[in-house]
From Swiss-Prot:
Alphabetic keyword roster: DNA-binding, Isopeptide bond, Metal-binding, Nucleus, Repeat, Repressor, Transcription, Transcription regulation, Ubl conjugation, Zinc, Zinc-finger
Provenance organism: Mus musculus
Cellular-component GO terms for this entry: nucleus
Protein name: Zinc finger protein 90
Domain KRAB, chain residue ranges per copy: 14-85
Amino acid sequence: MAPRPPTAKPQESVTFKDVAVNFTQEEWHHVGPAQRSLYRDVMLENYNHLVSLGYQVSKPEVIFKLEQGEEPWISEKEIQRPFCPDWKTRPESSRSPQQGVSEVFLRTNVLSHTTIGDIWNVAIQGHQESGRRHLGPEASSQKKITTLEKKIEQNKVGEDSSLSTDLVPQLDISSSIRPSDCKTFGNNLEHNSELVTQSNILAKKKPYKCDKCRKSFIHRSSLNKHEKIHKGDPYSNGTDQGAQSGRKHHECADCGKTFLWRTQLTEHQRIHTGEKPFECNVCGKAFRHSSSLGQHENAHTGEKPYQCSLCGKAFQRSSSLVQHQRIHTGEKPYRCNLCGRSFRHSTSLTQHEVTHSGEKPFQCKECGKAFSRCSSLVQHERTHTGEKPFECSICGRAFGQSPSLYKHMRIHKRSKPYQSNNFSLAFVPNTPLPQGEGLLTEVKSYHCNDCGKDFGHITDFSEHQRLHAGENSYGSEQTLLGQQSLSHPREKPYQCNVCGKAFKRSTSFIEHHRIHTGEKPYECNECGEAFSRLSSLTQHERTHTGEKPYECIDCGKAFSQSSSLIQHERTHTGEKPYECNECGRAFRKKTNLHDHQRTHTGEKPYACKECGRNFSRSSALTKHHRVHARNKLQES
């Protein structure tokens, strides 16, 4: 076996252009969305792997474009020839287009997964140019990507094998280009054990797995870079510090903003000029970037090329897939520097940061009220215009906000619900909504067969079921203050020794016990009033501060308690969840149901101390007291 190549890296002579796969603008426009995603993943891994191996590789423009989501094509004159002068080449006329495409495949897969000293085919890019001249732009771009995909499937190698020159004939690469022809690196390149990494990409293996989110990678360097996201490393987004600190020569004459590349300046200037050169052939809508046009065209075709491997959900944009996958991995890379809270989306972090600054930049022109979010302002403006774009497909009632319609639709009886022992699952037919809103085309409701209450989420429904079952949510034997341990999962282990009332949770029992002891550990600093519960103190303090954090999205009315907001929202949705078992009459508030039930039972718990007359409602007793007050005034 030939000795391994020297470990010294010829850093000064290596640039990323020597190992890159490049497209012209015309070729790039013939590449589909899924193929563009494949190209982006391979190129970024190529660059990141070279940097992780210690090579002084300056960030090229194509990588900068890929990281920014821009189009990575370059002009013909920018495509470079091979850097190694010792490699022999065949005359251009004797080389077929297919051979050039095959070379693209080998270079794409090999160069990004080994050290530069182990790669013999970094110089074949110059040969690709001769093959490119034989192909049109569409054929050239399609052959590059298609051959790349096919060869990955056809040339899978075993786990213990390594890539050597035996693979070269399979890829139809000209025999005039061999590692033995290179006097700079020599024959040592044929027997490099580090090429075993190549088997991972051909076999689609990702042996390096993140312990926190279980995401897998082909290279250890990619894993190391990913782990910085969890650690909060400020340079974990793949930004090259050297490029960041480099000079920006291209300045916008309108706003003074500078850019590293002229193409970036050209695209930026379209913001000022309003130029949108890329127009949709279907609807005529124009865009500043061709990538935006490609994403828009998917809306017409319905194509969703980006599919989640875990749940199968498909998306039109790769960025949407990346954001969706964070739901499965739990990754929240955007962290607030003030409170440490993390978010899956950068927009969510931006909206959250406003809560710290208190800034409300969006102001209503009608009444002057300010909001921290643009969406909140849009919702508020409907209270002035009276616009109600969300209409119920069953009864025709319209609402100003989509959540109000969502809540309203739960009150309708479902014709064919899915029944189970504990709940019903129902769907509202798929009906179009105004302004293209499709979020309400499918409404799921969990219906309790014991009390008839509906829930929008399975977690809320499960919690509600415990009220009927008396189930201990902890699911284990617990004791509190000498109480007996839980002997059955449906028992309430925490029982009050004074009144005998039992509770599922120890915290509920402790709060209840303060009723008997009179303990009120939570005291208001303003007026000195004390409370037995912390939540009661929090609500009381709002009477001093005037804070009303719970705002109705329909009319803008604010409340100091969330329960008050819930009751108020029912005036908009028409929901009446509390139904009388005797006559079927429904009510918005539980207290109204209790008052009504006394008309059936005849109970009158409110007695007048003056005359002894009894009433079923406290409000009726209050009115009655006024009669005695007037009589006393008349007598005096």
